[in-house]
Amino acid sequence: MSAMSLRPDVLSARRVLAVQPHPDDNEIGAGALIARLRDQGCDVRYVTVTDGSMGTMDPDMAPAELAGLRRREADAAASLLGVSENRHLGHRDLLDSPMPGLRAELMQEIGEFRPDFVLTCDPWLPYEAHPDHRAVGMAVAEAVSFLQFPHVPGAPKDAPAQPVVAFYGTAQPNVRIPAGPYWQRKWEAVARHQTQFPPDALIQLRAFAESMSQGEEGFFEPFKVLHPFFLHFNPAAVLA
């Protein structure tokens, strides 16, 4: 059994659950892939775990007001990529981590939607300081790992097959997916998050991303794609 044989092609996905810690993470990490999958007819559903209410440096911006703005921005960005359903779980940004019940919530989301792939942020990213990113990525990995164990809290009664996990925002990618014409749409979607990225900040973010994602055939998005086989007691995961 080789690592390659256990690395299904995410571009062949038919149903993808994209789980983001904050309202802008899916677009930043995987916006081009999501747009491409939707154009191919793949069914994509978002799950947004936190309300993003701490994401401001403005002392006059009330958290509740920001949460409302960010929810509207998130739905607009998803819509631009062709995603019509965004499930907002409503956890408080930063304040609710480590979110001990999140694994069970995500097991229910996976059980209901029955995806063949789950997209989320890589909780093993070195030096990741945001607890929401660590908590959400790990909760996704745990939810996939324990999905078919009926006595684990949150396990669905009619558990589907375990989906493959594609981690974005990773330092150890094993797949680099060419963005092609979807690169521009990705950044149009990121631009919908106006509370997070005023024009100057958006220009800087895009320039940095392009400096890190330039391949021989144009820009790409990197992912660590892991079959569930690699999510427990498997040192080969780092090489997968």
List where the protein language model places each region.
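Metal-dependent de-N-acetylase/amidase catalytic core
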Residues: M1-V19, D96-A240
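Active-site rim/loop-helix segments in enzyme catalytic domains that contact anionic ligands
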Residues: M1-F113
